[in-house]
């Protein structure tokens, strides 16, 4: 709703707006749902994508002009290139589990806008049960190593088969 209101406001002020909205089509939840339903990932997420568009139309919310999907080959390639660049700068690292993580310790001001103190972070249930190995509690996955629970949802990369993490998806699509 916010994006719709902002777009309408800017257009009323004479600005030309080109809006892009990522519809997450690969993450832990979609893979799990796909597996549990016995459907291919693309078929599973298509149902939710269609319902989302119907909701937009029902509420008369303006659609974005572009809806990129993280699973498009050009974005997967972009994500891999971005992770390689971060890795070469020491900002990303591959852990023992073969996943690649973003090293938050390289950014002392991370969380400043949200008034977060990284030293005071404690694991939540989700983080405590995280299946991935990382240097610090705040580090997040850029590339998740393939796991048999992922089924056929994986791409080849310099770190082995795996899939993108949520954060890098948006970064790659926003800068493509």
Residue ranges and their predicted role:
Residues 1-176:
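NTP-dependent nucleotidyl-transfer catalytic core
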């Amino acid at each position: 709703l916010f994006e719709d209101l902002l777009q309408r406001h800017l257009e009323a002020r004479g600005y030309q707006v080109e809006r892009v909205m990522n519809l997450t089509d690969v993450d832990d939840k979609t893979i799990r749902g796909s597996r549990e339903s016995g459907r291919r990932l693309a078929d599973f997420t298509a149902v939710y994508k269609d319902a989302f568009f119907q909701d937009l139309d029902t509420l008369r919310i303006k659609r974005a002009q572009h809806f990129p999907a993280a699973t498009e080959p050009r974005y997967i390639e972009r994500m891999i290139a971005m992770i390689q660049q971060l890795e070469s700068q020491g900002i990303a690292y591959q852990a023992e589990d073969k996943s690649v993580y973003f090293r938050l310790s390289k950014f002392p001001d991370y969380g400043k806008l949200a008034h977060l103190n990284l030293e005071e972070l404690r694991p939540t249930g989700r983080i405590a049960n995280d299946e991935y190995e990382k240097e610090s509690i705040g580090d997040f996955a850029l590339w998740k190593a393939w796991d048999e629970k992922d089924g056929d949802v994986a791409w080849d990369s310099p770190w082995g088969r795996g899939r993108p993490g949520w954060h890098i998806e948006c970064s790659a699509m926003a800068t493509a």
